[in-house]
């Protein structure tokens, strides 16, 4: 069992992970404590869900043209109707908390209005839904070899193309999936 706090780390889905919802997933852990964990998949763009269109559906006027092109992400299978804004900066919004020194998560509409206007938010990703684990569940999945752990960094979190994130995270920790054995504990 892991005693480490994995907040502000990435979970890299092992190739043998049996749950197809997480195949080649890269999950950013927003919270990990004795009660469980919450994370957001950051490498699954929703091709039919542009951030601008989602904001317009909420009756938020979009004046920043880039927002009309930005893709929302599938954050995970839990509560896919709920939006989570992962962003740089400080937790200055109505429903916001800091994950690390310069990464926050916000669920209130005030940040969406600022994003729509292209104001006050540096890097951001709008994720629909989240992944969560109950008490000790993530520890068990780690012990089973379902996930690999990688320290988070802002470049991978916000700037790396979505389709490259899973592999680049594995590369960061020196893992070549072509040579990774699924037979845990045996040489």
Curated annotation (Swiss-Prot):
One GO cellular component term: cytosol
Gene3D superfamilies for the chain = VC0467-like
Show which residues constitute the signal peptide: none
Domain of life, per lineage? Bacteria
* InterPro entries xref list: AlgH-like
State the family named in the UniProt similarity comment for this chain.
Answer: Belongs to the UPF0301 (AlgH) family.
From the Swiss-Prot or TrEMBL record, give the protein name.
Answer: UPF0301 protein Psyc_0057
